[in-house]
A protein has these predicted regions:
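N-terminal cationic amphipathic segment used for targeting or macromolecule association
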Residues: 3-6, 32, 57, 63-65, ...
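Small/flexible residues
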Residues: 18, 49, 57, 78, ...
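Short, hydrophobic/π-rich interface segment
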Residues: 35-71
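C-terminal edge-of-domain segments
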Residues: 62-87
Protein backbone atom coordinates (compact mmCIF):
# COMPACT_ATOMS: atom_id res chain seq x y z
CA UNK A 1 0.00 0.00 0.00
CA UNK A 2 1.27 3.48 -0.86
CA UNK A 3 2.60 5.52 2.04
CA UNK A 4 1.48 8.92 0.78
CA UNK A 5 -1.10 10.44 -1.52
CA UNK A 6 1.71 11.36 -3.94
CA UNK A 7 2.94 7.76 -4.08
CA UNK A 8 -0.62 6.53 -4.66
CA UNK A 9 -1.09 9.07 -7.47
CA UNK A 10 2.21 8.09 -9.11
CA UNK A 11 1.29 4.40 -8.92
CA UNK A 12 -2.09 5.15 -10.53
CA UNK A 13 -0.69 7.13 -13.44
CA UNK A 14 2.20 4.70 -13.97
CA UNK A 15 -0.33 1.88 -14.31
CA UNK A 16 -2.24 3.92 -16.93
CA UNK A 17 0.65 5.22 -19.01
CA UNK A 18 3.69 3.14 -20.04
CA UNK A 19 5.69 6.32 -20.80
CA UNK A 20 5.29 7.46 -17.19
CA UNK A 21 6.17 3.97 -15.91
CA UNK A 22 9.37 4.10 -18.01
CA UNK A 23 10.33 7.53 -16.65
CA UNK A 24 9.87 6.35 -13.06
CA UNK A 25 11.92 3.23 -13.81
CA UNK A 26 14.68 5.47 -15.21
CA UNK A 27 14.81 7.51 -12.00
CA UNK A 28 12.85 10.59 -13.08
CA UNK A 29 11.13 12.59 -10.35
CA UNK A 30 7.69 14.17 -10.77
CA UNK A 31 7.96 17.95 -10.40
CA UNK A 32 4.57 19.50 -11.15
CA UNK A 33 1.63 19.71 -13.49
CA UNK A 34 1.54 22.89 -15.57
CA UNK A 35 -0.76 24.46 -18.11
CA UNK A 36 0.19 24.11 -21.74
CA UNK A 37 0.84 27.38 -23.56
CA UNK A 38 -2.45 29.29 -24.07
CA UNK A 39 -4.38 26.80 -21.91
CA UNK A 40 -4.46 28.70 -18.60
CA UNK A 41 -7.84 30.20 -17.69
CA UNK A 42 -8.21 33.85 -18.64
CA UNK A 43 -6.77 36.22 -16.06
CA UNK A 44 -4.80 33.50 -14.27
CA UNK A 45 -1.07 34.04 -13.87
CA UNK A 46 0.70 30.71 -14.09
CA UNK A 47 3.98 29.38 -15.42
CA UNK A 48 3.50 27.31 -18.55
CA UNK A 49 4.96 23.88 -19.12
CA UNK A 50 7.60 25.43 -21.39
CA UNK A 51 8.65 27.91 -18.69
CA UNK A 52 9.07 25.09 -16.16
CA UNK A 53 11.09 23.03 -18.66
CA UNK A 54 13.39 25.97 -19.43
CA UNK A 55 14.06 26.71 -15.76
CA UNK A 56 14.81 23.07 -14.97
CA UNK A 57 17.11 22.69 -17.98
CA UNK A 58 19.00 25.84 -16.94
CA UNK A 59 19.43 24.24 -13.51
CA UNK A 60 21.09 21.23 -15.17
CA UNK A 61 18.24 18.72 -15.15
CA UNK A 62 17.24 16.31 -17.87
CA UNK A 63 13.54 17.10 -18.37
CA UNK A 64 10.63 15.16 -19.85
CA UNK A 65 7.02 16.21 -20.42
CA UNK A 66 4.10 13.77 -20.39
CA UNK A 67 0.33 13.68 -20.32
CA UNK A 68 -1.48 14.53 -17.08
CA UNK A 69 -4.04 12.34 -15.35
CA UNK A 70 -6.27 13.43 -12.47
CA UNK A 71 -6.75 11.45 -9.25
CA UNK A 72 -9.36 9.25 -10.93
CA UNK A 73 -7.00 8.44 -13.81
CA UNK A 74 -8.74 10.64 -16.39
CA UNK A 75 -6.62 12.48 -18.98
CA UNK A 76 -6.34 16.29 -18.53
CA UNK A 77 -5.47 17.58 -22.03
CA UNK A 78 -4.83 21.24 -21.06
CA UNK A 79 -2.00 20.25 -18.70
CA UNK A 80 1.48 18.75 -19.01
CA UNK A 81 3.32 16.76 -16.35
CA UNK A 82 6.92 17.86 -15.81
CA UNK A 83 9.57 15.30 -14.79
CA UNK A 84 13.24 15.86 -13.93
CA UNK A 85 16.40 13.85 -13.46
CA UNK A 86 19.97 14.86 -12.77
CA UNK A 87 22.17 13.51 -15.59
Amino acid sequence: MAETAKEAYLALIAARDPEIRALLDQGFEFVTNAFKVDAAPSGMKARTDQEHVGRLQQAGYQVEVTAVYDEQGQLRPSLSAIWRKKP
